[in-house]
């Protein structure tokens, strides 16, 4: 945890470190090294800290390469998490920094059984899709058991227990059939007062539950380890943690300073950077820049390092957000959660903050290859106006008559965001999660130069991975400093003798 990570006090005295990038990895490294006594300088290309943790508020400018700049005009207090948007409760390190610096958190509703699933031209609530699928799968398995098709696969006692489990799991009738939708799937008419008994829905068929391949991931989503409840978000915007760490090291951070070259000067490093033609020299460097950008920066890296930096693909996720009155709450009883669709916008995120307030920011598209791996590239290629159109059409399907209430739209295509060009590295992992020699090479220091970032962790695409990688780089750097100290002391003893 962050509270338990601490270098020996004063262990960095007399040593200097330049850190490239003020995203989470860079900020964490700066904070930990600074309090250990290192002379720290952080160079950040943007006019803000946080990197891919980016909260857009009214008055902010959105720059995408090759496109007209956008200017957010959200009402006061409203915001859009254009990048990172949720934190799993198991991400102890980043949550540790939130705790340490007093960042207030609230629940992020990552699943809502009432939210719509729009697939195959039909919109149905998630609860009906999920629990009717439970019923249909259980029905098939119960039939197989009753027809003795599984007698050779399981012992009799286990089969009996499994058959009983299916009865409850799938809401089957006494004959093992899923003849009518369970109450878990919702109602044709809701239960009410004195004379309002509920009426059940007809059970959906497997064809209706599995209309196309795109629907597979939404069924699986909630089972992903990092997507299970409880999920969290900082109150007021995801950038709160980055800003809190930045506050601890603000004098050390220089914004608007893009790196133009990374050079080794003997046992030290020299960084060439903007604005203008400036240089910063230090004993050590920690590079937290994305690999796809680092590859293009002139450097003195070894041939193996340069080769390892090539060909790492980054996910070009795209989001679209609108301000709107909270019709999803007033008309559909949706307080947070996600809607899913086989349309190009893939995913809709209902805000988990400001419940019952007049307005909110609705993320009407979050395209990351959830339902089709080609969707991020296809959606990113659309003009901003086309992204808005596709997103509004999706909201209209989910909430008929309400798309006209969407206003103040903004869109961020991460493949076009300067100094990012993607939200995170995509590793083609082998058996057991192995990433091979390329990954191993990227982890290695280059003399006095160390490396960190979400791409150098097994918690990629998350703030947790960025923070963990910073800790790893710091430990390597600290070990070298300690070793240099021991070597120096040994020389002194030998000279004195």
How would you describe each model-predicted region?
Residues 4-143, 494:
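N-terminal glycine-rich phosphate/pyrophosphate-binding loop and immediately adjacent elements
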Residues 7-11, 71-80, 217-230, 247, ...:
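Short glycine/proline-rich turn/loop motifs
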Residues 145-258, 265-268, 281, 297-298, ...:
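Active-site/ligand-binding neighborhood in enzyme catalytic cores
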Residues 124, 132-146, 151, 294, ...:
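Rossmann-like dinucleotide-binding core of oxidoreductases
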Residues 127-148, 198-213, 292-293, 428-444:
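Core domains of carbohydrate- and sulfate-ester-processing enzymes
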Residues 2-6, 28, 36, 268, ...:
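Conserved flavin/dinucleotide-binding core of flavoenzymes
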Residues 255-367, 398:
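Mid-domain catalytic core of redox enzymes
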């Amino acid at each position: 945890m962050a509270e338990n990570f601490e270098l020996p006090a004063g262990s960095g005295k007399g040593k200097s470190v330049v850190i490239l990038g003020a995203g989470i990895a860079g900020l964490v490294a700066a904070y930990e090294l600074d309090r250990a006594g290192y002379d720290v300088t952080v160079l950040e290309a943007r006019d803000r800290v946080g990197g891919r943790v980016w909260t857009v508020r009214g008055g902010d400018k959105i720059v995408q390469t090759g496109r007209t700049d956008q200017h957010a005009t959200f009402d006061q207090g409203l915001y859009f998490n254009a990048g990172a948007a949720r934190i799993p409760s198991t991400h102890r390190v980043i949550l540790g920094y939130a705790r340490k610096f007093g960042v207030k958190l609230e629940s992020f509703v990552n699943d809502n059984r009432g939210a719509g699933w729009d697939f195959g031209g039909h919109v149905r609530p998630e609860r009906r899709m999920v629990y009717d699928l439970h019923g249909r799968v259980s029905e098939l398995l119960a039939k197989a058991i009753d027809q003795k098709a599984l007698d050779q696969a399981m012992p009799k006692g286990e089969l009996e227990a499994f058959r009983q489990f299916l009865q409850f799991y799938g809401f089957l009738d006494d004959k093992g059939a899923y003849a009518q939708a369970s109450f878990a799937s919702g109602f044709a008419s809701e239960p009410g007062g004195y004379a309002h008994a509920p009426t059940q829905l007809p059970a959906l068929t497997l064809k209706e539950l599995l209309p196309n391949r795109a629907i597979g991931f939404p069924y699986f989503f909630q089972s992903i380890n990092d997507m299970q409840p409880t999920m969290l978000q900082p109150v007021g915007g995801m950038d709160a943690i980055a800003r809190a760490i930045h506050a601890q090291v603000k004098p050390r951070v220089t914004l608007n300073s893009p790196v133009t070259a990374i050079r080794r000067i003997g046992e030290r490093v020299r960084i060439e950077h903007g604005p203008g033609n400036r240089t910063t020299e230090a004993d050590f460097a920690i590079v937290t820049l994305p690999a796809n950008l680092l590859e293009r920066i002139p450097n003195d890296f070894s041939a193996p390092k340069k080769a390892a930096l090539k060909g790492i693909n980054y996910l070009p996720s795209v989001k679209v957000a609108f301000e709107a009155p909270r019709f999803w709450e007033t008309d559909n009883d949706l307080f947070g959660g996600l809607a899913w669709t086989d349309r190009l916008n893939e995913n809709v995120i209902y805000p988990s903050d400001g419940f019952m307030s007049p307005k909110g920011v609705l993320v009407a598209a979050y395209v990351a290859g959830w339902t089709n791996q080609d969707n991020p590239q296809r959606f990113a290629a659309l003009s901003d106006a086309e992204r808005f159109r596709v997103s509004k059409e999706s909201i209209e399907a989910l909430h008929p008559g309400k798309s006209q209430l969407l206003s103040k739209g903004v869109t961020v295509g991460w493949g076009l965001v300067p100094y990012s060009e993607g939200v995170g590295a995509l590793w083609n992992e082998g058996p057991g999660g192995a990433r091979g020699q390329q990954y191993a090479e990227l982890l290695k220091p280059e003399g006095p130069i160390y490396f960190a970032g979400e791409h150098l962790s097994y918690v990629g695409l998350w703030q947790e991975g960025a923070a963990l990688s910073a800790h790893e780089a710091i430990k390597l750097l600290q070990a070298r400093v300690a070793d240099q100290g021991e070597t120096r002391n040994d020389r002194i003893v030998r000279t004195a003798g």
